[in-house]
């Protein structure tokens, strides 16, 4: 058969040539006459075999080549006619995905014999016919055309073929046209350093290539340098792609970027330590290469140390094969394996890709797992699930317990009892304090309370010339009115004073467990003050009473501040006009928080006992004329004033439990007086207080509070004044008590005097050293109305409160006997 006939047969015109041998052949484009089936290698090859009446090669019809996308050819035993049909069918293939052409046997001579004709090729017997130029040239052209045109091709393996000189360049040009290749192998093809350079220059731009096999290709250190250049270019390209994907703060998955993953350079003994140096320098900063095969590459301990240095920086490499390198010691080989964490081959388990299985979101994506890893992961998930179940059960129990506590009706009572038992005095609940506030009212109405209060009268003395002593006990007239208006109350069994003190002691022990040291310090200070004072020491009942009053004292929510002191300049000219005053914390708190004005404060009632506290003093004359104190003279003589001159009222004890009364109470008293009673001592006392408080002062200075000096004046410095009020003076119900005021428990002074059972009251007034005027001149005649008191104070008679009390008791007994 001539060459022209073979050419025509390749182009599909064999039938026309047979029918018209003497006619001129007109070439037609192959796509016009070829069907879709002819573009597949397998269909095209079977058509050609049928046309030539030849039996197909058994290897193509085997199970390995059963699919139309896979082709594996072994060219050792194929004849010339078989190669002609195979090359023609492969030349136009567009379906194959894997193409493998290999020689099973390796021959020492890899050159191509210059046999260019079919006749001479059929007579070639020394080696397989593929080593002839006629067959090998047509095969390379068919492979190159298939690689460049078939975009479905992903695997190309040309193993053991004599790809030398221009043949490898033809394959390399075809590789550049196909960007879908993932695996390229030239194993045992003996391409040399020149062929390696050509292939590497093409493969470094293939972004999808993953496996590049140059094993047994006769490479040297120069070829290793070309491989290093290919790896470097691949690294730069992938870093660029990773940077593009990391824009807008996105995370980059290294596995999603394509490129080389496996480089196989085994059985190239000429590479040596010099070639491995090029490769390790590039791999130090690479993050994509997973496997390097340098088996039998003539490496020594120097190359092994270079590999260890590379592995210290590169953690992406999972396998670095250095077997069959006689120059590397076993210790360094073991070190490389330990650094990689590789398991022995016999202990390695197969890995499975479970990404396609639904319901396994907890497993890492795009990663194969072994059975042992899957079991350990399952065990960890079970432990986590059991822990979550335990937490859920505990939460349900706690929720149920809290709901039961909230539904119980006595839950609030239990909380209050716990607060009363465990809390300190500052942390007592409001209910507990409110219960203690009820106790003073019960105790005040008892006879034992009045008897114990009289013991304090003996050692008491009036310390202020402005305020008279008042008691908080309801008067007899008030009690009679309440009994008339209201039904008889239930009988209350009052405890004795000793039992009440015991109960209060028990409460105080429970509350004051944390303040025992402070109480000891206070007792020492009290003992020191008692030793310095001239008054007689209090008895045991009085000390119990003070403790009782401290417990009964109502706790005001007052913000504690530091004591502020007004300082004045050391100017002798202005020293008489300016005062150095110090205010206590309670005074500042009352002024700022409660807005109390202490400019004019006084008591409104006199109780049915004759108790005089050092913080109280009553001033008034009996009869028509009242005792008037010269306040202007006192202000001129004494630049430093005491606190009681400006209306501070102190109750029983130290006075911290009593409120300060506002000056508006004076106006209320004056407005509620009956017309005819204005000449009484209360009306004159009120008018004197208003005039003296506002005399010579402007708006702000009138209401400016003054601190009080807690000074006690002994009984010897007091003089007595006898006051009397006409029993015929009748007051209205509004004059007797201020029922709409905040002090309903107090009664006016006229309530006591209007009763026929009581006589005149003796009042103690403090004697001042600065008084230059005679008290008798200011008092005038005090016997108006036939009172028992005398207005003559010239003798400065000093009486004892005990005598007053005894006289009152005798008078009371006489009236009862009468």
Swiss-Prot record:
Gene Ontology cellular-component terms for this entry are: centriole; centrosome; ciliary basal body; cytoplasm
**Biased composition, Acidic residues: where in the chain?**
514-539
Report the leader peptide range: none
Which residues lie in Basic and acidic residues bias regions? 561-589
Q: GO biological process annotations for this chain's record?
A: cilium organization
Keywords, alphabetical = Cell projection, Cilium, Cilium biogenesis/degradation, Cytoplasm, Cytoskeleton
Q: Where in the cell is it found?
A: Cytoplasm, Cytoskeleton, Microtubule organizing center, Centrosome; Cytoplasm, Cytoskeleton, Microtubule organizing center, Centrosome, Centriole; Cytoplasm, Cytoskeleton, Cilium basal body
Stated role: May play a role in cilium biogenesis.
Q: Which PANTHER family match?
A: CENTROSOMAL PROTEIN OF 78 KDA (PTHR24110:SF3)
Protein's name according to its UniProt entry: Protein Cep78 homolog
Q: Whose protein is this, by species?
A: Drosophila melanogaster (Fruit fly)
């Amino acid at each position: 058969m001539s060459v022209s006939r073979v050419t025509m047969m390749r182009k599909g015109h064999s039938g026309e040539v047979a029918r018209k041998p003497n006619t001129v052949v007109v070439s037609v484009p192959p796509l016009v006459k070829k069907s879709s089936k002819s573009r597949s290698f397998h269909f095209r090859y079977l058509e050609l075999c049928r046309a030539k009446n030849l039996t197909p090669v058994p290897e193509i019809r085997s199970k390995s080549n059963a699919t139309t996308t896979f082709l594996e050819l072994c060219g050792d035993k194929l004849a010339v006619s078989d190669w002609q049909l195979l090359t023609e069918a492969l030349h136009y293939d567009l379906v194959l995905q894997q193409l493998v052409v290999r020689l099973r046997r390796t021959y020492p001579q890899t050159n191509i014999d210059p046999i260019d004709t079919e006749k001479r090729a059929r007579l070639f017997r020394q080696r397989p016919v593929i080593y002839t130029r006629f067959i090998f040239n047509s095969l390379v052209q068919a492979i190159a055309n298939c690689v460049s045109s078939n975009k479905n091709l992903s695997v190309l393996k040309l193993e053991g073929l004599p790809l030398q000189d221009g043949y490898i360049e033809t394959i390399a040009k075809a590789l550049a046209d196909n960007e879908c290749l993932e695996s390229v192998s030239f194993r045992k093809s003996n391409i040399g350093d020149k062929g390696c350079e050509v292939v590497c220059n093409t493969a470094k731009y293939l972004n999808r290539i993953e496996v590049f096999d140059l094993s047994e290709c006769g490479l040297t250190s120069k070829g290793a340098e070309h491989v290093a250049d290919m790896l470097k270019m691949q690294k730069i390209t992938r870093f660029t792609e990773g940077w593009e994907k990391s824009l807008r703060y996105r995370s980059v998955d290294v596995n999603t970027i394509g490129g080389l993953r496996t480089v196989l350079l085994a059985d190239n003994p000429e590479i040596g330590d010099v070639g491995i140096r090029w490769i390790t320098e590039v791999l130090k900063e690479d993050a994509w290469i997973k496997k390097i095969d340098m088996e039998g590459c003539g490496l020594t301990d120097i190359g092994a140390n270079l590999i260890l240095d590379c592995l210290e920086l590169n953690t992406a490499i999972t396998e670095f094969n250095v077997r069959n390198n006689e120059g590397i010691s076993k210790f360094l080989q073991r070190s490389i394996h330990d650094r990689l964490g590789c398991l022995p081959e016999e202990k390695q388990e197969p890995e499975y890709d479970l990404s396609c299985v639904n319901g396994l979101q907890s497993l890492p994506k795009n990663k194969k797992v072994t059975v042992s890893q899957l079991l350990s992961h399952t065990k960890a998930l079970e432990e986590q699930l059991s822990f979550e179940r335990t937490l859920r059960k505990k939460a349900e129990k706690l929720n149920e317990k809290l709901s039961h506590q909230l539904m119980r009706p006595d839950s609030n009572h239990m909380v209050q009892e716990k607060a009363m038992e465990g809390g300190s005095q500052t942390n007592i609940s409001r209910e507990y304090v409110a219960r203690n506030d009820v106790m003073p009212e019960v105790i005040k109405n008892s006879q034992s309370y009045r008897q114990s209060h009289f013991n304090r009268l003996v050692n008491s003395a009036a310390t202020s010339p402005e305020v008279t002593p008042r008691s908080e006990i309801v008067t007899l007239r008030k009690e009679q009115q309440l009994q008339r208006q209201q039904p008889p109350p239930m009988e209350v069994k009052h405890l004795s004073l000793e039992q009440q003190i015991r109960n209060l002691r028990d409460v105080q022990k429970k509350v004051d467990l944390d303040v025992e040291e402070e109480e000891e310090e206070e007792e020492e200070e009290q003992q020191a003050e008692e030793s310095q004072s001239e008054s007689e020491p209090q008895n045991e009942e009085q000390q119990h009473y003070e403790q009782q009053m401290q417990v009964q004292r109502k706790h005001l929510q007052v913000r504690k501040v530091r004591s502020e002191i007004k300082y004045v300049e050391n100017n002798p000219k202005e020293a008489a006009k300016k005062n150095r005053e110090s205010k206590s914390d309670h005074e500042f708190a009352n002024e700022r928080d409660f807005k109390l004005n202490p400019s004019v404060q006084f008591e409104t009632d006199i109780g049915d006992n004759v108790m005089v506290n050092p913080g109280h003093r009553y001033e008034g004359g009996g009869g028509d004329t009242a005792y008037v104190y010269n306040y202007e003279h006192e202000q001129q003589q004494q630049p430093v004033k005491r606190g009681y001159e400006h209306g501070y009222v102190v109750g029983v004890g130290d006075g911290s439990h009593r409120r300060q009364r506002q000056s508006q109470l004076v106006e209320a008293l004056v407005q509620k007086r009956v017309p005819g009673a204005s000449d009484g001592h209360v009306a004159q006392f009120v008018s004197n207080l208003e005039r003296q408080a506002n005399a010579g002062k402007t708006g702000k200075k009138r209401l400016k509070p003054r601190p009080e000096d807690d000074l006690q004046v002994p009984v010897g410095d007091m003089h007595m004044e006898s006051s009397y009020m006409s029993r015929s003076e009748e007051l209205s119900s509004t004059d007797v008590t201020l029922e709409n005021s905040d002090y309903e428990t107090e009664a006016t002074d006229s309530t006591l005097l209007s009763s026929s059972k009581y006589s005149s009251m003796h009042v103690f007034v403090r004697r001042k050293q600065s008084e230059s005027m005679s008290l008798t001149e200011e008092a005038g005649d005090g016997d108006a109305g036939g009172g028992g008191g005398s207005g003559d104070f010239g003798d400065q008679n000093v009486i004892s409160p005990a005598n007053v009390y005894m006289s009152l008791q005798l008078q009371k007994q006489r009236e009862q006997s009468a």
